Amino acid sequence: MVNFEVVKQYLFELGYEIQKEDAENEIVVITDKNIGINNLVIDCEEPIIILEQFILKLKDKNDAQVLSKLLKMNRTLVHGAFVLDEDGENVLFRDTLQLENLDLNELKGSIDSLVIAMNEYAGDFIGFMK
């Protein structure tokens, strides 16, 4: 529970408002639509922290061109990756970090990676949904 409280404090220091919290499962959700964060789920699962945000639903989960583009996008990300959910229908941003040594800058870097990716690839994501 200590690490969960530290993560919440870091989010506060970074200026994020916790939209939802499940203290029992050590999960928080933050949103800042002005910078591309929309229901970013932050889950403290000892020994790691998982950051995950829904990006889009694929029109065709077997579209090799879209899947190839997602892999190429991953190469440019500083932290995290675009991944598919269990059904292969939804694209998510996902990153994992070690909780034991987590510091403010590391958490900020992961969130910033999502923000940069959303800005850089917004046009591609819109194209994937057409």
For the regions a language model picked out, list residue spans one by one.
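Charge-rich, low-complexity N-terminal segments
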Residues: 1-37, 76, 83-84
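Long, continuous compositionally biased terminal/linker segments
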Residues: 33-58
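Long, contiguous binding/interaction regions
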Residues: 116
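Well-ordered alpha/beta subsegment
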Residues: 79, 83-109, 123-130
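Hydrophobic residues embedded in beta-strands of well-ordered beta-sheets
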Residues: 25-28, 47-49, 89-91
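Extended Gly/Ser/Thr-rich low-complexity repeat segments
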Residues: 42-47, 106-112
